[in-house]
Amino acid sequence: MSNPEQFHRASRRQLLQAGAAGVAVLAAPAIVRAQTGPKIRIGFWPVAAGLPFFAALEKGYFKEAGLDVEPLKFAGAQQVMEAMLSGRGDGSANGTGTANLAIGEIAQPGLFKIFCTNPSNVKYVLDEFITGKDSAIKTMADLKGKRVASGPGIQNTTLCKTMLERAGATGATVTELPIGQHVASLVAGQVDACYTLEPTGTIGRMNGTTRVIEAGVVAKYILGDPMAPWHGGAGSLTTEFIKKNPEVSKKFIAAYARGVELVRTKPDEARQFMKGYTAIEGPLTAEVPLASYMLYNEFKPSDIAYFQKFYDLFSDKGIFEKKVPVEPLIYKA
């Protein structure tokens, strides 16, 4: 079993390996590091798990490496994947649903490589069910026959329906709704609960309108262990981009790894960079729980196994038309 403390703290050696490709360029004179390479278009959607990417942008890590990175904001992870499929995007930031990415892999085998995931669980929270502050709903089982909203796309809806089923909440109806509307829909009484991702739960809690029913739900109900790492989101680059720009790709991943390192070692400094990229602002950023992060060179066999178990849910349910092996999708330097 993967220990969350282990997957939260990378060894210095692994971080140095991930960052090694960027050392030479970061030491080069500014004139050498001028942004002359290709534009790197990275899709994201407004969830807290994208923090290493937001931090790397705002701290100037990409610019320091001489990279021209363009963040592309989408309403959901499905659109991020579609942009990669159509050639309008070169990769994804953390938080982009790994099941959404897998659908792209099925449509176009060899589409992308994952260089960083954001494992979450009951300790490192990203996923949760929330309800109105004064609601009578106390447990997941209380959602029996209720109206539940989930984030958009096949990953969110499949997980939401499966978790409700496994928690004994039979007869619940699930509706897709952008996560930015989850708190408002609960306040307006349009739904009884939402399966959502941070920072939504924090926003509702801090403005006194919603509360969490249960957090870290995917690890518990899908993977069978509240402390299991759910590799539900990932930073990736398209294989086409990597092949055309191998050195630029290494520099990009090295600069991105600096964002991961900042989140790991200085979370309070990093949190502020959610502002402008997610729906959370100002002092509220200090309240958001953070997911963990795992770089491509930090995966252990147990991590691959839990990641595979997550993917197998979608093939077992017929959402994926075939089994998608995880290991070949992980970037190799």
Describe these PLM feature segments.
Residues M1-S11, A21-V25:
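N-terminal secretory signal peptides
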Residues A30-A34:
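Sec/Tat signal peptide C-region and signal peptidase I cleavage site
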Residues Q35-A167, T173-L177, S185, D192-E198, ...:
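Short, glycine-/small- and polar/acidic-enriched structural segments
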Residues E64, V122, V217-A228, M294-I304:
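Short, solvent-exposed loop/beta-turn-alpha elements that line the ligand-binding surface or hinge
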Residues P71-K73, Q79, G208-R211, G233, ...:
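N-terminal secretory/targeting leader peptides
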Residues G97, Q181-F273:
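Pocket-lining segment of extracytoplasmic ligand-binding domains
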Residues I242-I319:
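Secondary-structure end/capping motifs
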Residues Y311-A333:
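Conserved C-terminal helix/tail region of periplasmic/extracytoplasmic solute-binding proteins
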